[in-house]
Amino acid sequence: LNKGKCTEILACYEPAFRFMAEWWKQLYGESEGKNGIGIFPASLEYTADLHSMGQYVQDGPRKLYETVVSFEKSLTSFAVPFGMGDPDGLNYLAGRDLHDICRTARDAVKAAHISGGVPNIGVSVDKRDEAGYAELVCFFELACAISGYMSGVNPFDQPGVEAYKKNMFKMLGKPGA
């Protein structure tokens, strides 16, 4: 099923996606991490993590694969301004839309990671709005249930969580614990 991969990285080029990625890690960690098996869920926020973690993904051990979430349409528009004297060396981007620049970064990183041997799955939704997030929740919950059953675990229980909660409640003196 996982072809020797033990880590799935969920990546997105949208900072506002951070908390959705945290939800995704909880969903997959609680649902699949059982009986000594399961793929470790991790997340990266590109482009912020590209220079640090991008190096690891590109040239590190080949025990991971990447799922990249993309929003095809931006909710806002921002054109890169022209800087007098080109102080940051970015005038070649002047007038270009930030969403288009991020899309180009996504495509360039995907090509590099694939050529470097990192399997890459793309998940695309129209916009980062309520409907887009609802599509992602439905997709990931269904995918998680299917992959859990295919791995031979019940994706709907959490015995590991119950074990630490039981210990914590007892240590804190919760009545009946």
Q: How should these model regions be labeled?
A:
Residues 1-177:
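A SIS-like phosphosugar-recognition module
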